[in-house]
Amino acid sequence: MMERFEKIEMKIPAKAEYVAIIRLTMAGVANRMGFAYDDIEDMKIAISEACTNIVQHAYKEDVGEITIVFGLYEDRLEIMAADNGVSFDFNSLKSKVGPYDINKPVEHLPENGLGLYLINTLMDDIQIMHDEGMTVLMTKYIQREQVENDGNPISTYKSY
């Protein structure tokens, strides 16, 4: 039997000014699902990096489209960011992705190339497909055991 989930799909122009719309939508979805604040912030960074990579690399001078699909499962949020633009040599790029030498001064860190490293670090799972264009599938699981209700109410009323 197939696992039940809900799907939200969005298409936006591959322009930097539209990335915030995706980020805000994802934050709203994750909040409604019950994700912790820190996990939502991590996912906002990851989705921003994925979309920014598309904007910068997929379409060169042309304006293309970013397709975002959110898969809402009981225990996780799956986020797919896809383009139909020019793909790049993924294996070459992957070999250059972190970890970075913490003993080197920050001035020696590359200006670009941290995106995939950040996504991989912040998300629970990441898959990248690069046939026609590029598709990044990111997964974050809900950590429900972080805050527990102990059943003892707190009162701000002071009794004398």
Swiss-Prot record:
HAMAP family linked to this entry: Anti_sigma_B
The molecule here is called Serine-protein kinase RsbW
State which Enzyme Commission number(s) the record gives.
2.7.11.1
Signal peptide residues are: none
Could you confirm whether the keyword Membrane appears in this record?
no
Question: What the protein does?
Answer: Negative regulator of sigma-B activity. Phosphorylates and inactivates its specific antagonist protein, RsbV. Upon phosphorylation of RsbV, RsbW is released and binds to sigma-B, thereby blocking its ability to form an RNA polymerase holoenzyme (E-sigma-B).
Q: What species is given as this protein's source?
A: Bacillus cereus (strain B4264)
Against PANTHER family, the record matches this protein to: ANTI-SIGMA-F FACTOR RSBW-RELATED (PTHR35526), SERINE-PROTEIN KINASE RSBW (PTHR35526:SF9)
